[in-house]
């Protein structure tokens, strides 16, 4: 869905991943990029570039919980001409999902229920996202989708 990200993309093999990384490095070199950039590629044709995001990335939250060094820290390191940090991931998968709610609602009750149900869930109050890391994709999907549905009021348990 548009409200869910899975990192790394399921089904992507190491050759495809390496091709995308090399393309990104080539683009960065061609334009003299200093800092970080997010490249969005087509899920069906990974060589088809959909968007280049120079500012706050759409998928930046996943890196805060799923990567040794997150997007924002990497950007700061690059701008300050410091060595970049490890891009190693913490688990096999990181899932994030946007949360839909009334902007005037009290988030305390949903957070209390969801955090008690699964302490592994991580919430970003600013971007209204939930995230979780692990190795079982099906279980992670179930957790994130349940959280989104509960938070939005679609379900009440």
PLM regions with names:
Residues 1-45:
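Internal nucleotide-binding/catalytic subdomain
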Residues 1-3, 12, 60, 70, ...:
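Residues in flexible loops and secondary-structure boundaries
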Residues 48-51:
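Protein kinase-like catalytic core scaffold
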Residues 77-157:
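Peripheral (often C-terminal) accessory segments that flank ATP-dependent C-N-forming ligase machineries
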Residues 10-14, 58, 68-72, 114-121, ...:
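Short, low-complexity, polar/charged sequence segments that are solvent-exposed and flexible
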Residues 45-46, 65:
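Contiguous C-terminal substrate-recognition/catalytic subdomains in enzyme active sites
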Residues 2-5, 16-17, 59-64, 140-142:
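A short, polar/proline- and glycine-enriched secondary-structure boundary/capping micro-motif
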Residues 19-38, 53-102:
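Active-site "cap" helix and flanking loop/linker of ATP-utilizing ligase/carboxylase catalytic domains
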């Amino acid at each position: 869905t548009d409200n869910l990200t899975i990192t790394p993309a399921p089904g992507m093999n190491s050759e495809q991943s390496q091709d995308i990384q090399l393309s990104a490095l080539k683009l960065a070199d061609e334009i003299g990029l200093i800092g970080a950039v997010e490249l969005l590629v087509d899920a069906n044709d990974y060589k088809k570039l959909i968007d280049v995001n120079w500012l706050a990335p759409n998928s930046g939250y996943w890196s805060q919980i799923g990567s040794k060094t997150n997007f924002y820290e990497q950007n700061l390191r690059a701008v300050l001409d410091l060595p970049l940090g490890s891009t190693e991931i913490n688990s096999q998968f990181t899932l994030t999902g946007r949360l839909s709610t009334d902007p005037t609602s009290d988030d305390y009750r949903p957070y209390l229920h969801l955090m008690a149900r699964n302490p592994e869930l991580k919430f970003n109050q600013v971007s209204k996202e939930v995230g979780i890391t692990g190795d079982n994709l099906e279980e992670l999907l179930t957790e994130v989708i349940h959280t989104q549905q509960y938070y939005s009021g679609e379900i009440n348990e």
